[in-house]
């Protein structure tokens, strides 16, 4: 199939008319008859099948019967919207909720009776109805590192022992990009240092540092630092 398509394409390019418009029309005509080019009809059919395979469509979904507050607020919402066109729907809902709470039981009773009547009609019309609330889409949670840091058991040190002064800066991570904002430096002085093997700044370090407190962090060390100073950025 690929060879036949290549030979057909070669014949198109060898045609007498070398104008770009003619060549483009020939290629498009060849692509329509070839199975190598997907058509829009297949994708549109897939879209219809996907939409049709949903749990419930908007027209088939049965609405819940109205409660007393909804029965009361229908006319009230319409009146408030006409009298105050500048008010938003959320503000109108808050105002209606406060006003509904201020009504007495005697004032609410007719609306409760109407709501019970509507529920009875709904049960007769849909005997097997079960309320199925729509699930809200789960919000994508920001991926955080498994831990803010890992146990710092090996660090790069020079051949001689130096007390380490770590400058810590917070890093705010957003997606795949991170912006570093420096906070107040925090000095952590190691009290006990034990060197097991020799190491240099370019090779793998085999030195183990034991301190009074455990330092947990990913340590992006920089080679151009002075022997006794290392900068650590903690993902925050």
Curated annotation (Swiss-Prot):
DNA bind region: 62-130
GO biological process: cell differentiation; male sex determination; positive regulation of gene expression; positive regulation of transcription by RNA polymerase II; sex differentiation
Keyword RNA-binding: no
UniProt feature, compositional bias: Basic and acidic residues: 43-61
Family annotation (InterPro entries): HMG_box_dom, HMG_box_dom_sf, SRY, SRY-related_HMG-box_TF-like
Keyword Transferase: no
Tissue expression as described in the entry: Expressed in the genital ridge.
Keywords: Activator, Calmodulin-binding, Cytoplasm, Differentiation, DNA-binding, Nucleus, Sexual differentiation, Transcription, Transcription regulation
Pfam families the UniProt entry points to: HMG_box
Cell compartments where the protein resides: Nucleus speckle; Cytoplasm; Nucleus
Annotated segments matching region Disordered: 32-61
Classification via PROSITE patterns: HMG_BOX_2 (PS50118)
Gene3D superfamilies, sorted: High mobility group box domain
SMART domains given in the database record: HMG
Gene Ontology molecular functions: calmodulin binding; DNA-binding transcription activator activity, RNA polymerase II-specific; RNA polymerase II cis-regulatory region sequence-specific DNA binding
GO cellular component: cytoplasm; nuclear speck; nucleus
Similarity comment text for this entry: Belongs to the SRY family.
Record's subunit section: Interacts with CALM, EP300, HDAC3, KPNB1, ZNF208 isoform KRAB-O, PARP1, SLC9A3R2 and WT1. The interaction with EP300 modulates its DNA-binding activity. The interaction with KPNB1 is sensitive to dissociation by Ran in the GTP-bound form. Interaction with PARP1 impaired its DNA-binding activity.
Task performed by this protein: Transcriptional regulator that controls a genetic switch in male development. It is necessary and sufficient for initiating male sex determination by directing the development of supporting cell precursors (pre-Sertoli cells) as Sertoli rather than granulosa cells. Involved in different aspects of gene regulation including promoter activation or repression. Binds to the DNA consensus sequence 5'-[AT]AACAA[AT]-3'. SRY HMG box recognizes DNA by partial intercalation in the minor groove and promotes DNA bending. Also involved in pre-mRNA splicing.
Name of the protein in its database record: Sex-determining region Y protein
Organism: Sus scrofa
Gene that this polypeptide is encoded by: SRY
